[in-house]
A protein has these predicted regions:
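Short conserved micro-motifs at the rims of enzyme active sites and ligand-binding pockets
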Residues: 82-84, 144, 154-156
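A structural signal for isolated positions on well-ordered beta-strands in alpha/beta enzyme cores
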Residues: 120, 141, 167-170
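Accessory nucleic acid-recognition modules appended to NTPase machines
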Residues: 1-139
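Active-site ExK catalytic segment of metal-dependent nucleases
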Residues: 139-149
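Hydrophobic alpha-helical segments
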Residues: 65, 88, 144, 158-160
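Catalytic cores of nucleic-acid endonucleases
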Residues: 147-172
Length: 172
């Protein structure tokens, strides 16, 4: 359907970025309601194209209530649907950052299904961690992706303080 196609384009454009369902509806024409959009996002996820990573919280209920962070399963889907030239991706730090973060996210998603991992993101106020990966109840890793330009404040110290058993990983 046209709405699913529009959702895919929107999600690929905003890969590695949080977007609430309300904002999605504002961006999509003939959006219907959030239930329909969430269902289409689930179908795109099952097709291995695009998913909405949930915000990490120890409580499952709060994870489900969070706004998703879009993530493509393959960065070629992101670049092909955007129409943005390679030189622009290389020249604009924000675009390059989203591309690099999407590449790391795509790899994590590929490993997640093979190894039974949970892939999330985390933010408290302005402090943020790009990815939180869990395996079972006893293994937690916080991953920060660096791509050249400093973005906001890293929340790594805050996350590790709240979750002292978590491992710290910096990519880039």
């Amino acid at each position: 359907p046209a709405l699913m196609r529009a959702l895919f384009r929107l999600g690929a454009t905003y890969s590695a970025q949080e977007l609430s369902y309300t904002k999605m509806l504002g961006q999509l024409q003939d959006a219907g309601n959030t239930v329909t959009v969430a269902h289409y996002l689930d179908l795109l996820d099952k097709a291995g194209m695009l998913c909405g990573i949930q915000k990490y919280d120890a409580k499952e209920v709060r994870r489900r209530k969070s706004s998703p962070r879009f993530m493509v399963y393959d960065t070629s889907l992101m670049t092909a649907s955007s129409g943005i030239e390679k030189s622009r991706y290389l020249g604009e730090p924000d675009l390059r950052g989203h591309l690099v973060e999407s590449a790391v996210g795509a790899r994590l998603l590929a490993r997640a299904s093979e190894e039974g991992l949970g892939v999330y993101w985390w933010r408290e106020g302005t402090k943020e961690v790009d990815f939180v990966v869990s395996k079972g109840f006893d293994s937690l890793s916080a991953i920060e992706v660096k791509s050249g330009k400093e973005k906001g404040q890293s929340g790594m110290a805050d996350f590790l303080s709240a979750h002292p058993s978590a491992k710290r990983i910096v990519v880039g």
